[in-house]
Design a protein with these regions (language model features):
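The serine-hydrolase catalytic nucleophile loop
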Residues: 53-66, 230
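Hydrolase active-site cap/lid region
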Residues: 135-190
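Alpha/beta-hydrolase fold nucleophile elbow
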Residues: 111-127
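Conserved alpha/beta-hydrolase
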Residues: 64-86
Length: 275
């Protein structure tokens, strides 16, 4: 029996139905909270970490349900200091937290408990989460990753290096405008210092060799005013233009894909079939 996970419910499995469980995962002494959406069926499932941006108003849970119907386990969690997770919010912590969560879902007891295929654990991220997904892949922690309207942190860093005061003011406004109330302990001066210090290491275009070996999907939004494609998307495409494992899509929508959720889901579903 075939069905369309985009528009139809999955076939009923009374013995191994779809479900969800709350998560509390220790990361460097702080508890990360989140949810695991478990796909139906007895066999081990591929599993994705679905990473949100800053602060994380858009969590893409509509995508999580679609991907679960398509046979994927989906993890939606909050980084340290975000949305009630313990600890302090910092960009450096985000990358560390992702590694911790990947290790957690590859551990033998969790693999057995939640019917996970440990050889197929990937990352998919939106905005800041897209950058984090790319950096996680570049550092060799996954062999498949997708970035949705992904940030290039290196672009922010280069702007801070070249025009410190102007860029500092603009970046402060950008981060404050998205709303930082859900972020505990955020210190913009510390974040800006980290971005400057890591402006090359945190630029995905500097990791072309590593990313060219990854099964990669880059989805961008043509009308993205938060992270314009000419700064954050096209330069990375150019850096990876000779890699056959890199796929891309440009949708006519805004940063949150507000009027293109179905098109976004279909683009990702098509790519997931190649993972």
């Amino acid at each position: 029996m075939t069905f369309d996970p985009l528009s139809q419910d999955s076939p009923k499995d009374k013995k191994f139905p779809p479900s969800m469980v709350g998560l509390e995962i220790d990361s460097h002494g702080a508890l990360l909270n989140g949810v695991l959406y478990i796909a139906s069926g007895e066999n081990p499932h591929p599993t994705m970490l679905l990473l949100h941006g800053i602060p994380g108003h858009e969590r893409n849970t509509d995508l999580a349900h679609i991907f679960r119907r398509a046979g994927w386990n989906v993890v939606v969690f909050h980084y340290r200091g975000a949305w009630g997770s313990g600890g302090v919010y910092r960009f450096t912590h985000i990358l560390e937290d992702i590694q911790v969560v990947l290790d957690y879902f590859r551990s033998p007891d969790i693999v057995a408990r939640h019917r996970i295929d440990p050889e197929k654990v990937i990352v998919v991220g939106h905005s800041l989460g897209g950058w984090a997904a790319l950096m996680t892949a570049a550092n060799g922690f996954v062999d498949s990753a997708a970035s949705i309207a992904g940030l290039n942190m290196g672009v922010w860093g280069q702007q801070l290096v070249e025009s410190p005061e102007l860029a500092r003011s603009a970046l402060r406004d950008t981060i404050l405008d998205v709303g930082i109330a859900p972020l505990s302990g955020l210190d913009l001066d510390n974040e800006i210092a980290d971005i400057i210090q890591n402006h090359l290491a945190w630029n995905p275009t500097q990791h072309g060799d590593a990313l060219s070996k990854v099964n990669l999907l880059l989805v961008a939004a043509k009308r993205d005013t938060a992270l314009p494609v000419f700064d954050h998307h096209f330069p990375l495409l150019e850096a990876l233009k000779n890699s056959p494992s890199v796929k891309s899509a440009l949708l006519d929508t805004d940063h949150s894909f507000s009027d293109s959720r179905i098109a976004l889901a279909q683009t990702l579903l098509d790519w997931l079939r190649t993972v």
